[in-house]
């Protein structure tokens, strides 16, 4: 069980004295701390542990057009160099992410989020990009255009 009182007492009260802001393909982030995609779910999993707004951003887990259960277990194996995983892109699908995850995320995370779109055909990528593009708010289209074109 999470000790919310301990967490609340240990949250940073002030912004850092140094300017840690960075530009990621034209998108300004307060700092360069961005958990890797797939390690942070859709953000909700970590919000009881600390104020995730201290992050510069995060990349939500790989999201496909259709919901995917992922690979059968076991999905993780130890090896000499560490571990290997093959989760298999388990996710609720882009429409569920837009309808459920993003509105929930908006209630507690107030910074840019990086979408990780996955697919098995050009048409699936196009569908996901078109759907997620409707959710994006930019002051100019340049960050999206540069990111997609690379």
Which residues does each predicted region cover?
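Aromatic side chains
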Residues: 40-42, 125, 138
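Distinct, well-ordered alpha-helical segments
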Residues: 125-132
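Conserved small/polar residues in nucleotide/adenosyl-binding loops
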Residues: 138-145
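N-terminal capping/small domains of soluble enzymes
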Residues: 2-112, 119-120
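A short alpha->loop->secondary-structure connector
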Residues: 133-137
